[in-house]
Amino acid sequence: MSDHNVNSTFRKTLVELCETATWITSQVYAAKNLEKNDLITVDNKISALYPIAEKYDRSFRTTTVILDEELILKLENAASSLWNSLTIAMKAEKASDKYFNEVFCKCKIFATKLLSIHEALFRTNTNLLRNFKCYISSFKSASEYRFDDLITNTQQHSEKYLQIINENVESFSNEEKTEFKKLTFEFYLVNFQLYLSENDLDTANIYTAKVNITDNSKYMDADLLIELCRMIYNSTVMLKEINNPETQLVDVNIISFLKDVEKYLELPVENLKSHTDYSNLKYSVLIFMANCLVEGHPQASELEQCDHYLSLLQNEYPNKVDPFILAINLTKRRNIVNPAETIEEILMRMIMSVDVISNFQAVIASINDLSKMNTKFSIVCLDYLLINKLNSKNDSKFLGKAICSRFLITTQSKTMNDSEIAESLENFSTQMERIVSEPLTKHAISCIITLLWNTGKKLEKMEKYVVSIRFYKLALKDIISQNYSDRGKIQRALQVVYNKIEDYSNTVRVYQDMDEVDRQSPLCQLLMLQSFLADDKTEEALTCLQKIKSSEDEKSTDALILAVAECKRKTDLSVQGLLMIFDKLQSKSNSQTISSTSSSQTLSILRYTLQMIVKVSEEEPLETFINYLPTVQKLLQKAVEFLKTVKLLNQLPPDVEKEAIYQQSVAVNEIEWFASFSYNVAVKCLVDQSCESISEFPQYCIQFIDLIPVQDFTFPKMYHFTYWRFKATILQLIIAKEKAKQDQHQKDWDIYEKSEELVNSINVMKKSSEFKDGSSLEDRNTLHECFLEALTIHLESALMMPDQTRILDILKKTELYQDSRVDALLIDISSNMEDLPKGVLIEILETVLKRNMGPEVKERELCSWLRILLENAINLNHEVELRILDRVLKILNINQSSLQDTDGVLQTELETIATYCWNIGVNYIIKDNKSNGIVWCKHSMGFANMVNEGLQEQLYSLWESLASSANIDINSIAK
């Protein structure tokens, strides 16, 4: 290819580079409106052309190319324009978008490369220095934004230019040499900053030596030096953040760099100390260095440095609070005997030096911190601040906060005893009257009173009543609570303590100091009632009860109940008070009034009232209890209705409007209490036979239990409630039996049906897998006892009805249970019923005795059943099946060796059975039924043989006579 063609190609490419630079310049001037797609286009163009520009730069340095001056000038102008536009745009925009900054950095490097091509075509020292300067600037931008690839590129090119210039520096003029030194200095500075930010301290120190700022300060003006110091400071801050913030050692590298900055700030640079940023930067450097030293657990050698810098800071910057705080922290880290005293001294210097208002939070925090070590020292500092540093009118906001802090650190003190705390605050409250000229804010008053209230309550709970009184009295001082809306609450608390120490005269004195509204408070009247009762002033106490009853306060009902409870030792007063409770409750008995009662009080009123009735009734004759029963019934009915309403409304969607009283969750134990109370009242009524409406109470118990979501509980809790529902139903049936006097048949029939339903329900529970898996032995026993109780009622009701079919049904059902206890129950009930037809009794006995009886049936019980059967069979001339006798005799023979009869009952039973069998046998023989007669007589001797050989001998003797007279073979019964 000819030189002409080569030059033509170069020319075309350079023209394209110039046009691209010009186009990019236009984009840069529109930087505010650039979208990401625009940036991508710019980025793509640079990525495509930069390698070509790089190639041309190298070629032009090794190959001579002849180009017209106009093109070379155009290249310079395009590159310079692009560079200048970028410089302006990057200063103006300061974009936070990373890609924006990256593209603009690439643009700077592209512009620098074009200037480098120009320098290769038109070589001068000025162009060489300009390119070096541009590469340093690009290197600085890439370092600032942390674009690693661009950092490497610009750093390498800067190094290359540094080498080129060093090779040609002899030909430079003095001005050019000076410029080169400045640029070299700046290049080393950028490297220093880069390696320092990367925590490459060794390389950073190398560049520190190369920079040699102290000797080269003549090349620096105040702005550059301030910027340099700020850069090093910022780098050390970053380095501190990168390192473990909880390190236990002083970072010597950070301290070294900060000391360098301190030294640089003292260099003889013109206008340095008058620079607007000088003072703040120096303070930042010194305070950061002091902070690093103090926080790094300084050793003995470093403590002197800490003292030096803290002293320097406090002297040069007396209005700054941080040096004093650091001095306090350093004191804590030192192993000294009494650090609190030293800290107090530092705090006092701080308060006297700094602007307290602008540093209020820091000063108060330091005082609060000292209070944990020694509250008395902190109080000295805070009182000085309050008296000397705050103006009541101008600084009222801060004055209120400081006063609150005074009460806070004193009441929370761990280094003062209760009496010292009270005395300190009493003295301070006197000082407050001189300090405060304007009323304290509501917030400040509330804060102070809360602290005094809580302290008084804490001491009251600890039974330190005398000291607690001092805190309540402090809260009642006019300077503190004159405008407090709930002053009466504090006065009542004071009355409570006076009552506890039986200082009733002061209780009355506090009452006299109250506002009229607070005097009429139900709680205040309750406290006054206590004092009157203690002084045996019954009339005054009655007046208190009447005032509480008349009060419309939402707490008046509770207060009245508590007041009546206080009267328990005054029977007449107690009865009058109880009547007041009923009167007050009666006024709230209709639904409208009850619905307006506060939701938290509804059930408690009912519960407390019921408890009061029981309590009073226990100490009075039964008649009193009977008189109150209609009221009890009414209250329980109200409780049921209320809880049913709550349950129903809680099942509705949340957006359905409901009365406030029903928008509450009721605890299960609350419902259980009402169920238990209803049950116990029913039992008492049953025992005392004291109420016509007794059947309502077990029904209430059942209704309460039905309101409990037993399905939501685990088995033990579910069984507990189910069991008590069974018990309540049994109690209801027992009461129904007692009342069954008129319309006997109909009532027996109702009892029969209900008891049958109950027996079936219990059986279902017993057979359920849930019960079998989850029940304990005790659960199984208690449920079976419950089953037997229900079955007893069921059997009795069946036997009371003349319907033979029912009795047969009962016999069939009991056989299915296969339980000897059920059989025993069946016989016991039927045998003890005087009105039961004997034929029915015989049928029951025969049915039970025919069953396959297991070992659970005791021999005595078995003989008793047989004896009753034989006795009734003889009276009714009923033929008893012989297999019954065979079965009983067989069981007795099997168990003969283990028979126990310490009281002789079994012997009597067997002797009676033997006698009955003998008589039946004789009757058969008389009727010429000799075969049956022989069998019965033989069984008679068998039973006699079990317990009484004498009886057997006697019977056999009779048999010989009987057999002889009846022509029966005597040997048909073996002796």
Curated annotation (Swiss-Prot):
- Do you know which InterPro entries this protein is assigned to? Spo22/ZIP4, Spo22/ZIP4/TEX11
Judging by the UniProt lineage, the source's domain of life is: Eukaryota
**What does the record list as GO biological process?**
homologous chromosome pairing at meiosis; homologous recombination; positive regulation of protein sumoylation; protein sumoylation; reciprocal meiotic recombination; regulation of synaptonemal complex assembly; sporulation resulting in formation of a cellular spore
**Disulphide connectivity of cysteines:** none
Q: Which key words tag this protein in UniProt?
A: Meiosis, Sporulation
A Pfam family this protein belongs to?
Answer: SPO22
Got a GO cellular component term for this one?
A: condensed nuclear chromosome
Family from the record: Belongs to the SPO22 family.
Q: What does this protein do?
A: Involved in chromosome segregation during sporulation.
Q: What is this protein called?
A: Sporulation-specific protein 22
Which species is this record about? Saccharomyces cerevisiae (strain ATCC 204508 / S288c) (Baker's yeast)
Give the gene that encodes this protein.
SPO22
